[in-house]
């Protein structure tokens, strides 16, 4: 049996994805009832960060500790993948001392190359092309609040970025319709649209995408590494803010999500996080539970392989 990794959502079957989402909610209930569950005592998670993140570090480190294991944090100062030592060599050495690895970096090819030479499961904590761990949390959150997302309509408002790409994959796997509203020049990459055009519809304005949506999602206008484009992007995205008026075009029980951190007054209105249908705090917490379910799945799959 081949070693299992989680670099994109499609590294799972739809059945496996649904099982992980169900398990995430089970683990959440166990945590809330103070039940101690430590199946991975002695297991070590390596966390390689070339892009910093508060939520990613806390959720993974807390998760493996709650499982009875431990985590090692490697900052850009500690390891520079592909700079000084080939990624392939780093992967062989690092994975020989760990049980599972999470990488948060820039180029998606970095996690692919690392996984190709790793002896243990590798999780994509975020790359420029994909953010699959966030989709696990988003899907779990929607299901907990509204039930199945199959057949629903999701509106993505803003940049056709890594989050948007992962939503495109999720639409294909989970059977929902995805309406994407982006300014000209900021649409998702053509290769993602070409493969999943059957479940995606593009719009050049936020209002049309929001009509009758069951879920509205957005992200920052300028991601890490795009700071020099901030002013240009503010101008391009000015008409793509998620606010109370836009929510009024959606289905009455439409949920609102944002992966955080959010910039009030930019991609969202000053009060959007306090909207009655905003579930961003549950969404943020569910990073912990969804990633615990993912780690449990990958570690158990690796044990089967052994």
From Swiss-Prot:
It is an enzyme of class 2 (transferase). GO terms for molecular function: amino acid binding; ornithine carbamoyltransferase activity. The keyword rRNA-binding does not apply. Its EC number is 2.1.3.3. GO terms for biological process: arginine biosynthetic process via ornithine; citrulline biosynthetic process; L-arginine biosynthetic process. Pathway: Amino-acid biosynthesis; L-arginine biosynthesis; L-arginine from L-ornithine and carbamoyl phosphate: step 1/3. Carbamoyl phosphate binds at residues 53-56, 80, 104, 131-134, 259-260, 287. GO terms for cellular component: cytoplasm. It catalyses: carbamoyl phosphate + L-ornithine = L-citrulline + phosphate + H(+). InterPro entries: Asp/Orn_carbamoyltranf_P-bd, Asp/Orn_carbamoylTrfase, Asp/Orn_carbamoylTrfase_sf, Asp_carbamoyltransf_Asp/Orn-bd, Orn/put_carbamltrans, OTCase_ArgI. This is Ornithine carbamoyltransferase. It comes from Acinetobacter baumannii (strain ATCC 17978 / DSM 105126 / CIP 53.77 / LMG 1025 / NCDC KC755 / 5377). The gene is argF.
């Amino acid at each position: 049996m081949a070693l299992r990794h989680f670099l994109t959502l499609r590294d799972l079957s739809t059945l496996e994805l649904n099982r992980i989402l169900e398990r995430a909610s089970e683990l959440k209930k166990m945590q809330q009832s103070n039940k101690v569950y430590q199946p991975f005592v002695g297991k070590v998670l390596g966390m390689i960060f070339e892009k910093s993140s508060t939520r990613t570090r806390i959720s993974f480190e807390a998760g493996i500790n709650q499982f009875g294991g431990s985590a090692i944090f490697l900052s850009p100062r500690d390891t520079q993948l592909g700079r000084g030592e080939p990624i392939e060599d780093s992967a062989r050495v690092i994975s020989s001392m760990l049980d599972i690895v999470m990488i948060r970096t820039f180029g998606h090819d970095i996690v692919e190359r690392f996984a190709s030479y790793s002896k243990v499961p590798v999780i994509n904590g975020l790359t420029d092309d994909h953010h699959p761990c966030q989709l696990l949390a988003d899907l779990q959150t929607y299901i907990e609040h509204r039930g199945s997302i199959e057949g629903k309509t999701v509106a993505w408002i803003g940049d056709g970025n890594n989050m948007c790409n992962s939503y495109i994959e999720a639409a294909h796997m989970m059977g929902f319709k995805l309406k994407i509203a982006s300014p000209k020049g900021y649409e998702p990459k053509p290769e993602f649209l070409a493969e999943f055009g059957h479940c995606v519809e593009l719009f050049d304005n936020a209002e049309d995408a929001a009509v009758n949506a069951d879920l509205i999602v957005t992200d920052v206008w300028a991601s890490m590494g795009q700071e020099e484009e901030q002013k240009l992007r503010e101008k391009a995205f000015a008409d793509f803010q998620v606010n109370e008026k836009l929510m009024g075009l959606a289905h009455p029980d439409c949920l609102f999500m944002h992966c955080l951190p959010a910039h009030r007054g930019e991609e969202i209105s000053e009060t959007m996080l306090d909207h009655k249908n905003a579930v961003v705090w549950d969404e943020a917490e569910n990073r912990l539970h969804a990633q615990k379910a993912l780690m449990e799945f990958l570690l158990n799959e690796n044990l089967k392989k052994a």
